[in-house]
Amino acid sequence: MPVHMMMSGIIIAGGRSRRFGTDKRRLRLWGEQGPCLLERAVALLQPLCSEVLVVLNDAHAWPDLPARLVADEQPGSGALGGVISGLQAMQTPTALVIAADMPVIVPALLAALAQWPFVGDALIPSSYPHPGQLQPLLAVYRHSALAPLRRVFAAGERRLQVAVTALHWVDPGPELWQMYDPTARSLLNLNTPDDLKLVQAYLGTTNI
């Protein structure tokens, strides 16, 4: 696994968790002595990136998080606003972007994304095994993506999956999944309490 590439790691952490009912970022799925969800996300990116940024609305609540905290430029604007804020704040030409609520991302998949060659503004995988839905919160963005995303945002769009179609983006294709995550477990996220039950069941039967 590469160590400290000249690439930023950006975690979109938000802060509302309205559908979840509690602050899911503080869940300790790996035991009381283990990391919380947000700490785990930081730990995933640290070996790969020269800096790790966390975009969130409540930086004051995370004084001990070992990352650079970035205030969302447009609080309440969703993941698109978070990605824009992260790209604006990063100090490298490229960023590996993930969401804070994806607890079972395969580290080897992240490393592969970080090294995957591509031309354009972004490297955005499609869902697997049934392609079609882009995964813009498990992706690589160049700084060149910032201006078009800002334009789309200014035009009123708030859906990240729609906004990224304004970019010159590349899909690494099914080979990425087949080589590094054939079950596509990395796409599991926590949006509702029912999602938590699924992830807990997965963690109970898988060594992660």
Swiss-Prot record:
Annotated localization: Cytoplasm
Matches recorded under SUPFAM superfamilies: Nucleotide-diphospho-sugar transferases
UniProt-listed Enzyme Commission number(s): 2.7.7.77
Gene: mobA
Family matches, as Gene3D superfamilies: Spore Coat Polysaccharide Biosynthesis Protein SpsA, Chain A
Coarse class of the protein's main subcellular location: cytoplasm
PANTHER family, A to Z: MOLYBDENUM COFACTOR GUANYLYLTRANSFERASE
Keyword match Thylakoid: no
Bilayer-crossing regions: none
Family note: Belongs to the MobA family.
Enzyme class of the recorded protein, top EC level: transferase
Function: Transfers a GMP moiety from GTP to Mo-molybdopterin (Mo-MPT) cofactor (Moco or molybdenum cofactor) to form Mo-molybdopterin guanine dinucleotide (Mo-MGD) cofactor.
Lineage: Bacteria, Bacillati, Chloroflexota, Chloroflexia, Chloroflexales
Enzymatic reactions: Mo-molybdopterin + GTP + H(+) = Mo-molybdopterin guanine dinucleotide + diphosphate
Gene Ontology process terms (BP): Mo-molybdopterin cofactor biosynthetic process
Protein name as catalogued: Probable molybdenum cofactor guanylyltransferase
Binding site for GTP: I12, A13, G14, K24, D72, D101
Organism: Chloroflexus aggregans (strain MD-66 / DSM 9485)
Swiss-Prot/TrEMBL keywords: Cytoplasm, GTP-binding, Magnesium, Metal-binding, Molybdenum cofactor biosynthesis, Nucleotide-binding, Transferase
Top-rank taxon: Bacteria
GO cellular component, as recorded: cytoplasm
One Pfam short name: NTP_transf_3
Entry note about domains: The N-terminal domain determines nucleotide recognition and specific binding, while the C-terminal domain determines the specific binding to the target protein.
InterPro entries: MobA-like_NTP_Trfase, Molybde_CF_guanTrfase, Nucleotide-diphossugar_trans
Binding site residues for Mg(2+): D101
Cofactor(s), by name: Mg(2+)
